[in-house]
Swiss-Prot record:
It comes from Rattus norvegicus. It is found in: Cytoplasm. Plays a role in apoptosis. A motif (BH2) lies at residues 307-314. The lineage of its organism: Eukaryota, Metazoa, Chordata, Craniata, Vertebrata. GO terms for cellular component: cytosol; intracellular membrane-bounded organelle. This is Apoptosis facilitator Bcl-2-like protein 14. PANTHER family: APOPTOSIS FACILITATOR BCL-2-LIKE PROTEIN 14, SI:CH73-248E21.1.
Length: 326
């Protein structure tokens, strides 16, 4: 088990920062395997992410229709795994109605190998990510990873990377972002810095909205943009308080449009997006990893865990069968 300092637990009741809780373990596993793994072929913004619905059946989505990607569930972290990836156009950027001007080298192989612990560059733009990854590894390697945790985290990744774009589901249900997203949320990644503000409060609101927008991108792209923007660098050097953390996550989820879907489908998608966003925030904050994982654990317990347990647990709301978990 990883120990935390008093500073790590600032603003977090101890019971919400329990490294043995299912929420904490899911976030830690997801952060390590689906955010910090900065292999270009896996998480490049130009990566083709698979679609969960076929061209012939772009109707309402279901937990059963989420694309099955070969990710580790039962086996040890040290064994070599194969992750099969499709070649279709990325749906994630389309879902969030954003554009990326920065070109990345195309990823040629259809099948790539992921190995754990995953190697991360120790220099340049990945240096900060390496520090965070090391912190997560210490937590995960201190005890065996629960196969249930691995399956849940991997299912979250499947949902996040397989979501159909809004033009495919616009009139037939399916999650997307509402048409009424405030214009302030739409920033060109290569555009100018945040505009001057009349007050400190306006400046804070702009920074928060900027972070919300950037959370829609891949982890590597997010890291690059944070380093480019002096205002964002400043806020993350100081560290996020839980109240700001919660505001960012709330805004990120607020405009997800799941009208026409069942409560379980809608909440399952929002829970997956929340885990993805929280994991990215842990990657870019300068405070110890346990502190941010504690924030995420607290947030999930406040807004998702009670409902999840009332509806059969994480496996059920994410569409996992007993055979996949056992």
């Amino acid at each position: 088990m990883c120990s935390t300092s008093v500073y790590d637990l600032e603003d977090i009741p101890l019971e919400d920062d329990d490294p043995n809780s299912i929420e904490f373990k899911i976030l830690a596993f997801y952060a390590r395997h689906h955010v910090f793994k900065s292999t270009p072929a896996v998480f490049s913004p130009k990566l083709s992410r698979t679609r969960s619905l076929s061209q012939k059946a772009l109707g309402t989505w279901s937990t059963d229709s989420w694309t099955q990607i070969s990710l580790p569930c039962r086996d040890s972290l040290s064994s070599e795994k194969h992750i099969s990836l499709g070649k279709k156009k990325s749906s994630w950027r389309t879902l969030f109605r954003v554009t990326e001007k920065e070109e990345e080298p195309p990823s040629s192989p259809k099948e790539i190998h992921a190995q754990g612990p995953f190697p991360v560059e120790r220099q340049g733009r990945n240096q900060h990510w390496s520090r965070s990854l090391s912190s997560v590894e210490q937590c995960l390697e201190s005890e065996a990873v629960d196969s249930k945790v691995a399956c849940i985290a991997n299912r979250v990744a499947e949902i996040v990377y397989s979501w159909p774009p809004p033009d495919d589901s616009q009139s037939q249900g399916g999650g997307k972002f509402k048409e009424s997203v405030p214009k302030i949320l739409h920033f060109e990644l290569q555009g100018p810095q945040l505009r001057p503000c009349d007050s400190k409060k306006d400046g804070e609101d702009q920074i928060i909205n900027r972070i919300v927008e950037l959370l829609k991108y891949s982890g590597d792209q997010l890291g690059r943009e944070i380093k480019r923007d002096k205002a964002l660098v400043s806020i993350f050097q100081e560290g996020l308080s839980y109240s700001v953390f919660r505001t960012i996550t709330d805004l990120f989820l607020r405009d997800v449009d799941t009208r026409g879907e069942s409560e379980i489908k809608a909440q399952g998608f929002k829970a997956a997006l929340a885990i993805d966003a929280i994991a990215k925030l842990t990657a870019i904050d300068n405070h110890p990893m346990n502190r941010m994982l504690g924030f995420g654990t607290k947030y999930l317990r406040e807004y998702f865990s009670p409902w999840v347990q009332q509806n059969g647990g994480w496996e059920k709301i994410l569409g996992l069968s007993h055979e996949e978990v056992d």
